[in-house]
């Protein structure tokens, strides 16, 4: 762990480093696709599968500059000897099925009633489920097969040279690229057979149209009529002084609500700092919201949640008998506080939380049935699991740091549930952020990515501990061996295979003299061979068994993201969520983070059914991923606010020792629109070895 050095130069550097944002963005490729754009029949062409994990043509990490060179993915696969061996036609629908009717929810009954998007065969039989991957692509699950794709997009010639920087504006639009809704850029096929055998291949997919009248809205448009109808609610001055005075620039005048959180008042912003650069990019040139987005911003979600709900363009002035916000509730003297204060050197807190869940019904609980206050560890309750909070530095790795911390804590929670007793907790090294940063072909490295795709890599490839590939906050070359695909007869090797072991020539010698007493999980996972210990073999990798959006698909939060997220946290441990951070968030110190009337972009991404009911609650613009560990309630200015407890990735010097509280129950800045869960796998890799060892030692 890095030492804390309290010097003037260190503090100046820290102030510049802590506030990076687009380099922690979770919107990375210049694409935007919505659920309604993908509905209909798709033809999937599949290649052969093998035990080797393949990039299917992507670079590591995935790069925009590399992607645009592939203008025809189907042709690209064929030219690289990836012949198609089978074909499948599916129908992506906006109908829903119950999660419990498709997936095993025996140990997670709270998920059984989730409503997820259905996949049909050509005879209109339900064969699986699907989701958009935020707004970049989609994933289809049919039995033991998973098809993940990023949508095709290309520059339209209206802008300068192609770069790897994010080309989306603050409303999720771009003037520089066009997204295709009818074909994909990359497709990865994964098959999970019995006995944990995983096979991998590639696929190409394109929309099928039965008649010419169906061929419409194939591509996104950079300008539409709606963009001409905007409400000018803030100015465009991008001078630094106005950026620092962000409330005056961005939010409605006349906002008399007292602040719900405190800020630092001594932040030193240098012109060439990451803080200045980020604020200029995300907030100094923030565009006005389109009229449809302004309509959507007046309700909890972008889409109406029932047939009677209508869009309300009038801001509540507080002059009615109705509450100003559904999150402002009357003070209740009968609050139940179940926060635990266990010893951080043991699993005591996790065990007490687990025992508390055993006394509650297994079904999904209503909010009033859940504890008023609950946490898996935070500084306000003085029970943080560990002191050091990851500092992502000058790299947009928040999507990795957050998901891997949640994964680590869920490993600990799951071990407690399996062993059901108190024991010393030896998991004192974080999972390797750098492995995902350098080696993922789904995400864009320091330019950002999605926690959903981090989880996918954890399931398919496994993640070693940080000690084996330490975090450098740079896009180091992935140290995995790369070999040609067996079908690559012409030697081009454009489609690369990943072997599940680090190159013996990689720069690991510095770490060969590890004190294993300080990395107990490494000891449990290691084999006798020194070479195997310091090469990332199967036994040294932590696998995910399952992962998904909370609710079963993107935007499928049942019009009550608060409830389903609370249930998931309560049962299984921390989750990851994303939101759009305003400039005020950079200087957060304490309290409940909430900025009234912050112009947050969102869209309804689905058409209503005949009965006016929307199954999807829409797309929210987000730019930061964080961990949610619990929740609580706090009285501020005579009102009781509900909040989430979050863990950031900007080090201990930010916020409350690296943690923060954010408004709960109102989907503030999209916080309740796209959360994720991940489940550890104890049937293979390091998880299997550790569980068996601990069961033996504890006599289970």
From Swiss-Prot:
- Any binding details for the cofactor? Binds 1 Cl(-) ion per heavy chain.
Q: Which residues are glycosylated?
A: 52, 144, 265, 337, 373, 481, 490, 507, 615, 667
List the catalytic activities from the record. Release of an N-terminal dipeptide, Xaa-Yaa-|-Zaa-, except when Xaa is Arg or Lys, or Yaa or Zaa is Pro
Entry's localization field = Vacuole lumen; Parasitophorous vacuole lumen
Signal peptide positions (record): 1-27
Q: Please list the cofactors this protein needs.
A: chloride
One Gene Ontology cellular component annotation held by this UniProt entry: food vacuole
> What Pfam families does the annotation carry?
CathepsinC_exc (PF08773), Peptidase_C1 (PF00112)
- Report the pH profile: Optimum pH is 6-6.5.
Residue span(s) of the pro-peptide = 210-369
**SUPFAM superfamilies, A to Z:** Cysteine proteinases (SSF54001), Dipeptidyl peptidase I (cathepsin C), exclusion domain (SSF75001)
The catalytic residues are: 398, 624, 648
Positions binding chloride in this chain are 450, 452, 549
Q: Which residues carry this modification: Sulfothreonine?
A: 416
Main subcellular localisation: other
Top-rank lineage group of the source organism: Eukaryota
Annotated S-S bridges? 395-446, 439-478
- Identify the PROSITE patterns for this entry: THIOL_PROTEASE_ASN (PS00640), THIOL_PROTEASE_HIS (PS00639)
- Give GO terms for biological process: proteolysis involved in protein catabolic process
Q: What are the UniProt keywords, alphabetically?
A: Chloride, Disulfide bond, Glycoprotein, Hydrolase, Protease, Signal, Sulfation, Thiol protease, Vacuole, Zymogen
Any single GO molecular-function term of the entry would be:
dipeptidyl-peptidase activity
Quote the function comment for this protein: Thiol protease that cleaves dipeptides from the N-terminus of protein substrates. Active against a broad range of dipeptide substrates composed of both polar and hydrophobic amino acids. Proline cannot occupy the P1 position and arginine or lysine cannot occupy the P2 position of the substrate. Involved in host hemoglobin degradation by generating dipeptides from hemoglobin-derived oligopeptides.
Q: Which family does it belong to?
A: Belongs to the peptidase C1 family.
The protein's assembly and partners: Monomer.
Instruction: Name it.
Output: Dipeptidyl aminopeptidase 1
Please tell me the species this chain comes from: Plasmodium falciparum (isolate 3D7)
